[in-house]
Amino acid sequence: MPPELAHFHSPSYQHALTAYNLAHEIHGDAILFDHAQAARSNRQLWRDYPELRGQYWQIGSSGQGDFWLLRRDGNICWYDHDLGEITPAAIVDFAITFDQFLALSAYLAQIERTLDTNEHYFAAPAHRQAFAHALNHIAQGLFARYPYRYFD
């Protein structure tokens, strides 16, 4: 485990990083980094934005320039590259743990498989409502915080 990560409160992420090969897409908007990629990404992040060192650990990306962060307190956060310079104020706290992030990712992967076979799935109001309910079941208010819209 990288020594910098020891001060972050997320035993499940620390275990996953050291025990598994995390380098894979867990759903369309989340690609987790393995140990080596995480170390490289965080060195770059902290070189460019030293004020984030010790406060945020980059765990993955969207593949489109946005990225997922673990905050020191264990919460998962998100940064939208369209906002420009990275500042703590530009980082959105999802108020979820790594385990909840994995639950969210598993659910979104399932939804994406459904959309692959039925692109009009969300045309049904009941499906939109079930989606919002599922995200809010993972964490209260998560549907409102989630940045990628599957329907509007």
Q: Where are the language model's segments positioned?
A:
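Compact, glycine/acidic-enriched structural inserts
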Residues: 79-113
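N-terminal capping/interface segment
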Residues: 102-104, 117, 124
